[in-house]
Amino acid sequence: ERLGLVGLSGLTEFPHLHLTVRHQGKAVDPFAPAPVAGACGSDATLWDAAAAQALVYRRRVLLNHGFSDRALTMSEVENLAAGEPLPTSQSAALVAWVRMIGLEPGDTAQLTLHGPDGTVIAERRQPALERAQAQSLSLIGRKRPAPGWPSGTYRAQYQITNAGQTVFSHTFSVRVAADAPVN
């Protein structure tokens, strides 16, 4: 049975859901259903261990990533359908993109695109974040060279560092053939 809809409204940056739990007509906090007067928190919870573990806040979560033949907007990435066209040897551009949530202050993202021979085609390092970012879209790419994109596997590497430490890394690729991509 459908309970409601999840979506964007107002100035929100990502779909989210507000949940109210009621007990005997009163709203209760499911994370601290019976707080002690004057206490900042309680270990009591309405969640079983499995649910509590699933609800833990996760930092730096990869939502999706891919390759395109053009720079995509956040809206386009959010609405991509399975089987969207991938770059071919004659695509106007080759663009790698990554959508993340939960980035933290001090995070620096770097996205690097490598050609089939391993050379760096494009690289972008974003400045360190001054505050947490609910959602981000990173893109890197190049326009097609005159003879077209050489056939082979193109690799993108996305990395986040914070305080000099790598805190997240992901590599993905697409194979570009003379007539069509092969994932």
Feature-to-residue mapping (PLM):
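A short tyrosine-centered beta-strand micro-motif
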Residues: 150-161
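Short hydrophobic beta/alpha edge segments that flank linear recognition/processing sites
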Residues: 1-12
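Solvent-exposed serine/threonine-rich low-complexity stretches and specific carbohydrate-binding patches
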Residues: 121-132
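Acidic, glycine-rich catalytic/binding loops that coordinate metals and/or anionic ligands
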Residues: 12-97, 104-105, 114
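Aromatic sugar-binding surface patches on proteins
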Residues: 130-144
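Short beta-strand/loop motifs in extracellular/secreted proteins, especially
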Residues: 107-109
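Short beta-strand elements
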Residues: 165-183
